């Protein structure tokens, strides 16, 4: 089965959080049963202690995990980025990275640091025996995941690394242990140089890279859809885009930027 067939035949994993657009257009999060976490504790009780850091894809997910102590006494940190858009630099989280990413988001360095870098302080300052990454299969999540993995390699992290993905349709946490060694190179190829990777990667990441590179083109499927439906309101377009392109995983910010770009033409 090639990656395209794999992607078409498999529901995208949405990394624990089920996002719905409510009547006001704001996101609300449906947190599923805690029983899965109890089962996870039975299988991997060592992941619930103080020497473990959970890195979560976004602030909403982070707050829910932290407030509910879903992973027991372990630490939590959010990665509040959208690495699937805007330029990136080879060295992750250094001064040049921060400046480049801030400019891409039309943000000040101070504002970017407060939103993205400061919440990751535990990752930079504490030594953990294990880091658990909570990221899904869509492009948004996979590019964020790739960035964190690149940082772990660049910082010569020596502990264990687990990836926890969540299947929205049946609420099952899918856990695999990752071996560091190639992700900084993959990150550089894909997110810095915008090329396909020369490394062998899982079908999920292969497909995400493929879609990421496709989204860099002017005539990608999302842009075509917006162009054909530009008479719809932004809110109507957002609702349709979230429904039609789950494998992209963009949030409202990324889509609104594309919508405005096309409507201004």
Please report, for each region that a protein language model flagged, where it lies by residue.
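A structured, charge-rich N-terminal accessory region that forms the first stable segment of a protein
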Residues: 19-109
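A conserved mid-domain beta-alpha-beta active-site/ligand-binding segment of alpha/beta enzyme cores
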Residues: 173-241
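Short, surface-exposed basic-aromatic patches at helix termini and helix-loop junctions that form
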Residues: 68-71, 125, 146-158
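Glycine-rich, highly charged phosphate/nucleotide-binding loops
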Residues: 106-122
């Amino acid at each position: 089965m090639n990656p395209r067939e794999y992607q078409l035949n498999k529901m995208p994993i949405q990394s624990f959080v089920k996002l719905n657009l409510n009547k006001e257009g704001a996101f609300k999060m449906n947190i599923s049963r805690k029983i899965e976490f109890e089962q996870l504790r039975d299988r991997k009780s060592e992941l619930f202690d103080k020497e473990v850091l959970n890195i979560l894809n976004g602030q909403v997910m982070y707050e829910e995990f932290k407030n509910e102590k879903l992973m027991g006494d372990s630490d939590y940190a959010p990665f509040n980025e959208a690495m699937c858009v805007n330029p990136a630099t080879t060295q992750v989280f250094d001064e040049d990275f921060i400046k480049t990413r801030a400019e891409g988001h039309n943000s000040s360095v101070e504002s970017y640091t407060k939103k993205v870098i400061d919440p990751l302080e535990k990752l930079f300052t504490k030594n953990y025996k294990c880091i658990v990454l909570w990221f899904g299969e869509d492009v948004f999540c996979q590019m964020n995941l790739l960035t964190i993995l690149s940082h772990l390699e660049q910082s010569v992290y020596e502990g264990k690394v687990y990836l926890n993905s969540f299947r929205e349709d049946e609420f099952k946490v899918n856990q695999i242990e990752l071996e560091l060694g190639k992700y900084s190179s993959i990150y550089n190829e894909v997110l810095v140089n915008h090329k396909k990777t020369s490394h062998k990667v899982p079908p999920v990441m292969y497909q995400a890279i493929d879609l990421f590179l496709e989204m860099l083109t002017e005539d990608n499927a999302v842009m075509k859809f917006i162009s054909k439906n530009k008479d719809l309101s932004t809110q109507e377009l957002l609702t349709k885009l979230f429904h039609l392109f789950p494998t992209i995983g963009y949030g409202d910010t990324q889509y609104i930027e594309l919508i405005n770009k096309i409507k201004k033409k």
